[in-house]
Swiss-Prot record:
Principal subcellular localization: mitochondrion
Cofactor(s) annotated in UniProt: Mg(2+); Mn(2+)
Binding site for Mg(2+) 2: 380, 382
Species per Swiss-Prot/TrEMBL record: Neurospora crassa (strain ATCC 24698 / 74-OR23-1A / CBS 708.71 / DSM 1257 / FGSC 987)
Compartments reported by the entry: Mitochondrion matrix
Name of the protein in question: Carbamoyl phosphate synthase arginine-specific large chain, mitochondrial
Gene encoding the protein: arg-3
Role this protein plays: Large subunit of the arginine-specific carbamoyl phosphate synthase (CPSase). CPSase catalyzes the formation of carbamoyl phosphate from the ammonia moiety of glutamine, hydrogencarbonate, and phosphate donated by ATP, the first step of the arginine biosynthetic pathway. The large subunit (synthetase) binds the substrates ammonia (free or transferred from glutamine from the small subunit), hydrogencarbonate and ATP and carries out an ATP-coupled ligase reaction, activating hydrogencarbonate by forming carboxy phosphate which reacts with ammonia to form carbamoyl phosphate.
């Protein structure tokens, strides 16, 4: 046996990430670590010795023997018979559990991992059945899953599907925490045993071990792996006792919780009392443990098969010290500040843990590491695919989810070829010759009263991943990817900079930038305040020094070639350089190209270029001297959606992937540009070439020019690609496919948009361009309040506000004008009580080809992304449908649309009984977030048709899909993440707040909505006999209608004051009793007791406006419903529809409900 030699000290920066050497061996055998004396992993035969400077794993003689071996060929190696394939799991049909709607803590990474699992099943010839109500995902296309059920991921509905489909296997590891919790519940109910369903991959017992904090602690104790001192408790008093034994500060963690939900730090008894009470409403058990704030946080991704082969695929290090959830941390892969000894100590421990727990598949191990010693603690183990797995997979090029699925089917690592490289087996640890940086994206500014601090509970809605050859290059790229308004490492004004550095918020890196760039803080001072490792801070100091050097030179003419090259190697963008020398981006670009400075294209091959590998997974860098690829394809560039944020999510990834697939089907070569590690579009086999790169004008033009591309698609990735479309065409002379960017501009600019609508005779609400406060006030008086204030070029209603008084108008004008100073602000008459209609369409050269008309359940005033959509519409008559189609045709012609487009129209009843007014309020000349929904409900892929129109090939004939009578309908409902956003007011308005969506089908509106709403995460239908709390606006009859539906079912009815009680009792159809309960708005603990004592399981709060303060009764009622995990209805139409559903659906009938049908059964085939 060979033993590992640990070297003290630190390796050079780019080499310090523990690359392993594949050892040549005649048969498989285990290696033993000298430090831990545990077997580490089995290696593959015939692998070549790494010929790099790292020889720490082999003696000189072994190195010489291995050097003579040829580069490995996976297939030949497997076929040689060295590896005896084990008996594969005998399953014919496998149920795959999806993760449901996107929420904070559980996002698009599960579309990517679930899709990989389905791909593995298809390759193995095993039938797949998917349950996932998230209609916007790629995995819910029939091209991946054989059968799809759009249903809630609950034991009840999954049992119905098992009864119908009779699967013999189930995958629980690819649907995040939702699938894991479901598996544990079903095991406890004995359902797997009852129906003879095998859990594939990691067993439920192991999942329970990793999730139940008490069992987990005991398991690690058995193998002498240190964890933080902790106690698992079930009550608040037990938590206080545990804290007294451990000593403050402590951290609270909830079991079976997603993304740190229900966790946080407590420095004293009062903080702990509140936190423990809140956490115990979200989870039956919490862990109270000693806080290790300030230690380093390090993660390892480990893969193990049932033969006990085990490899570490990637290790990652958090830029931020422990104390910030890894989902809210800046993360670097591979680790940069660990010594060789630290690296291997943690690696050995990870493998020991994974083997001991019996993980079969993929696992994530998180550590706290003492900054100045070899002491460590295990923080957490995720025995499933996670957000970190998606990041590790994209960072290394190792197909983790796909490999985990194959292992679940009984394959061993040595017998699996690596699907990316095609030259190595899956039993080969990746090595990286680049650095990856992940930065989260928050959207906290969209929420009123929200707390901006970041800690152990995750708040970010998305993340970016940047690749560079130096940390500086990678880091600056990532910053620009988070938000195009950022130019790179920069600062911002803070009231108390030292406080900001000590107490992390979502603006943490901006505080570091301000300190170093503008306030001359030293590295030592920033480290002292922030506890960020000095290695990272010295790298940031390099950026600061370079920027200051350019500022001193003062002009573009003074910059020599070496200055520009140095800046580019440190990740500076052309715009950033221009700002430093008072020039323009275009002039810097011209000067750079004049010096012959262009980016080099490199491959991610998982092998650090040591063996030949055939990958199409690319990035650009200035820290190189040659290209890894050739550029003969002249393909079509598709711009992806970028970072997930509120307003732009997995729906646009579905659109980008659908466009790519359509182009490839037509024989076109495709080039995808995107930087979001959570997406299917950034998977290795989606496009012919994948550039993991920024979606900036600079980078897109670099790639377009290098590739000599035939055109660029800007209409399938949401708003981000649209924003650079005109520049790509006018300045870059790129060929933009589809609608002319000048026409896009005529739709985005409110003034031009309105003038064109007037010219074609399409109605719109009265509006005026704003130039001064006085003019605005005058116009508002003329048309009458309420009015809508909005800037041009918005996504998801950013800075749009409904104004109801002159005072409000003055307050809001400044905020709106600040959003987009180049574009004027427009004021529009807001029509209350109107119905909103969504139109998704595809046109070719101004002619309408396809259109879909969805109606909103909510009245106008709720953002379309937060609205409940119904398709086909349940309440629109034929005359209205015909008029809507006519408007769509006129708009397509006026803007000469080629490709996808979306319109929002409001329908306002005529008080004199004439035809209702149809007024266009918005038009986007791109795909919208409802394209996947309408495509899947109508059974026609709108993006496929739009892509054919873009390239002018096989353009379909115009078809009126809305003329077809259907015996089903579907409802799309929003997924909110209020629980994660402490303090935020759960109130719907013109600014979008939802993070995801679900959709279900049914024979009618009640069927579909009933299933859709139960698909929301942790939603529980209040049962008859439980308590319901009412409050809000009493000027309308909404609350009465709800009470009339629900009171016969036997619910107990409560109100927070006498006024609501009297209103309900006097207006209800039958005699009812409403009890007034004490409602202390400033005492959360007392409120919790009120909710518990009265068994309140549902809250209906229909307020007309947001609470002005945090003591407003309606705000407190809404916020606490969310905090206590109680279903909240805060919008009148959906609340009344849900009450109708409860009246019709409760008590639940025997047998399988009518909504439990395959997608293909509803739509009559498998077209997508």
């Amino acid at each position: 046996m060979l033993s590992t030699v640990h070297k003290a000290g630190r390796a050079p920066a780019l080499l310090r990430h523990g690359r392993r050497v594949p050892v040549q061996a005649s048969q498989l055998r285990a290696l033993t670590s000298g430090a831990q004396n545990t077997s580490i992993f089995q290696t593959q035969a015939n692998a070549a010795q790494r010929l790099s400077s790292q020889k720490r794993w082999l003696s000189a003689s072994a190195a010489a023997a291995a050097a003579s071996q040829p580069a490995p060929d996976a297939k030949a190696y497997i076929q040689s018979g060295v590896v005896k394939p084990r008996d594969h799991v005998d399953v014919k049909k496998v149920l795959v559990i999806g993760s449901g709607g996107l929420a904070i803590g559980q996002a698009g990474e599960f579309d990517y991992s679930g899709s990989q699992a389905l791909k593995a099943l298809k390759e193995a010839g095993v039938a797949s059945v998917l349950i996932n109500p998230n209609i916007a995902t790629i995995q819910t296309n029939h091209s991946l899953a054989d059968e799809v059920y759009y249903l809630p991921v609950t034991p009840e509905y999954v049992e119905y599907v098992i009864q119908r489909e009779k699967p013999d296997g189930i995958f629980l590891s690819f649907g995040g925490q939702t699938a894991l919790n479901l598996g544990v519940q079903m095991q406890k109910l004995g359902l797997f045993e009852k129906y003879g369903v095998k859990v594939l991959g990691t067993s439920v017992r192991t999942l329970e071990l990793s999730e139940d904090r008490d069992l987990f602690a005991k398991a690690l104790e058995e193998i002498n792996i240190p964890i933080a001192k902790s106690f698992a408790v079930n009550t608040v008093d037990e938590a206080l006792d545990a804290a007294n034994k451990i000593g403050y500060p402590i951290i609270v963690r909830a079991a079976y919780a997603l993304g740190g939900l229900g966790s946080g730090f407590a420095n004293n008894e009062e903080e702990l009392r509140n936190m423990a009470a809140r956490s115990l409403t979200l989870s039956p058990q919490i862990l109270v443990e000693k806080s290790l704030k300030g230690w380093k946080e390090v993660e390892y991704e480990v893969v193990r098969d049932a033969n006990n082969n085990c490899i570490t695929v990637c290790n990652m290090e958090n830029f931020d010290p422990l104390g910030i959830h890894t989902g809210d941390s800046i993360v670097v892969a591979p680790s940069q500040t660990l010594s060789d000894e630290e690296y291997h100590m943690l690696r050995s421990a990870a493998i020991k843990i994974v083997r001991h727990l019996g993980v079969v598949g993929e696992c994530n191990v998180q550590y706290a590491l003492q900054p100045d010693g070899l002491d460590y603690r295990v923080i957490e183990v995720n025995a499933r695919l996670s957000r970190s797995s998606a990041l590790a997979s994209k960072a290394t090029g190792y197909p983790l989810a796909y490999t985990a699925a194959k292992i679940g089917l009984g394959h061993s690592l040595p017998e699996l070829p690596n699907a990316v490289t095609k030259t190595t087996t899956a039993n080969f640890e990746p090595s990286l010759d680049y650095i990856v940086t992940k930065i989260p994206r928050w959207d906290l500014s969209k929420f009123q009263h929200v707390k901006r601090d970041i800690g152990s509970a995750m708040k970010s809605v998305g993340e970016v991943m940047a690749i560079g050859r130096t940390f500086e290059e990678s880091f600056q790229k990532a910053i620009r990817q988070v938000d195009p308004r950022f130019v790179g490492f920069q600062g911002d004004k803070f009231e108390d900079l030292d406080f900001e550095l000590q107490n992390p918020t979502d603006r943490r890196w901006l505080a570091v930038g301000q300190a170093m760039l503008h306030e001359n803080y030293s590295v030592d001072r920033v480290h002292e305040l922030s506890k960020i490792d000095k290695w990272f801070l010295y790298k940031l100091q390099n950026i600061v020094d370079c920027q200051k050097e350019m500022q001193q030179l003062g002009s573009l003419e003074a910059l020599k070639k070496e200055h520009i090259l140095k800046a580019k190697k440190l990740g500076f963008s052309d715009k950033q350089i221009a700002m430093a020398v008072n020039s323009t981006e275009d002039l810097v670009r011209a000067a750079r190209k004049g010096f012959g400075i262009r980016p080099w294209v490199k491959k991610i091959d998982t092998l650090a270029a040591e063996f030949p590998a055939d990958t199409n997974y690319l990035y650009t860098t200035y820290n190189a001297s040659s290209h890894d690829v050739t550029f003969e394809d002249k393909g079509t560039v598709i711009l992806g959606s970028g970072v997930y944020r509120i307003g732009s999510s997995v729906e646009f990834d579905w659109c980008a992937v659908s466009a790519t697939q359509a182009l490839r089907a037509m024989g076109e070569k495709t080039v995808m540009i995107n930087y979001n590690p959570e997406t299917y579009s950034t998977d290795f086999d989606t496009a012919d070439k994948l550039y993991f790169e920024e979606l900036s004008y600079e980078r897109v033009m670099d790639i377009y020019e290098l590739e000599s591309a035939s055109g660029v698609v800007v209409s399938v990735g949401g708003q981000l690609p649209q924003n650079i479309a005109l520049r790509l065409q006018e300045t870059g002379k790129a060929r933009v496919l589809g609608t002319d960017p000048r026409d896009i501009d005529r739709a985005e600019d409110r003034q031009k948009f309105s003038e064109i609508l007037d010219s074609i005779g399409v109605d719109q609400p009265a509006w005026k361009e704003l130039t001064s406060v006085e003019e605005a006030e005058k116009f508002a008086e003329e048309v009458g309040y309420p009015v809508l204030v909005r800037p041009s070029y918005v996504l998801s209603g950013a800075a749009m506000t409904v104004i109801r008084s002159k005072e409000d108008l003055k307050d809001k004008l400044e905020a709106a004008a600040n959003v987009s100073p180049e574009h004027p602000v427009v004021i529009t008459k807001f029509i209350e009580g109107a119905q909103e209609i969504d139109v998704d369409g595809v046109a070719s050269e101004g002619n309408l080809i396809l259109h879909a008309v969805s109606e909103h359940v909510e009245q106008a005033g709720v953002h379309s992304g937060d609205a409940t959509l119904v398709l086909p519409p349940a309440n629109l008559d034929q005359t209205t449908m015909d008029r809507v189609k006519e408007i769509a045709q006129k708009v397509a012609k006026a803007w000469r649309i080629t490709g996808p487009f979306n319109m929002q129209i409001i329908k306002a009843e005529d008080p004199e009984g004439g035809l209702p007014a149809l007024k266009v309020i918005e038009c986007n000349l791109r795909a919208s977030r409802s394209f996947p929904f309408v495509s899947k409900v109508l059974g026609v892929n709108f993006i496929d048709a739009a892509t054919k129109a873009l390239v002018g090939k096989n353009v379909p004939e115009p078809t009126d899909l809305m003329a077809v009578k259907r015996d089903y309908l579907a409802t799309k409902v929003p997924q909110f993440s209020w629980t994660r956003l402490a303090g935020a007011d759960p109130f719907l308005g013109v600014e979008m707040a939802s993070t995801g969506e679900m959709a279900c089908f049914g024979k009618d509106l009640v069927d579909a909505y009933w299933a859709s709403l139960q698909s929301a995460m942790n939603f529980r239908v209040p049962e008859p006999g439980e308590g319901l709390l009412f409050g809000g606006d009493l000027s309308k009859s909404w609350l009465t209608t709800i009470v009339d539906y629900l009171s016969p079912l036997g619910y107990k009815l409560y109100a927070a004051d006498n006024e609501v009680k009297q209103f309900l009792e006097s207006s209800a159809k039958t005699k009812i009793d409403v009890e007034v309960i004490a409602f202390p708005t400033n005492d959360k603990r007392a409120l919790r007791e009120v909710f518990a004592k009265n068994n309140i399981r549902g809250v209906f709060n229909l307020a007309q406006a947001r609470g002005k303060t945090v003591f407003d009764v309606d705000y407190v009622m809404r916020r606490n419903a969310v905090d206590f995990g109680v279903p909240l209805f805060m919008e009148p139409q959906t609340a009344m529809l849900f009450a109708q559903c409860m009246a019709e659906k409760l008590p639940r009938p025997e047998g399988i409900p009518s909504e439990v049908r395959r997608w293909s059964e509803f739509i009559g085939g498998k077209p997508l």
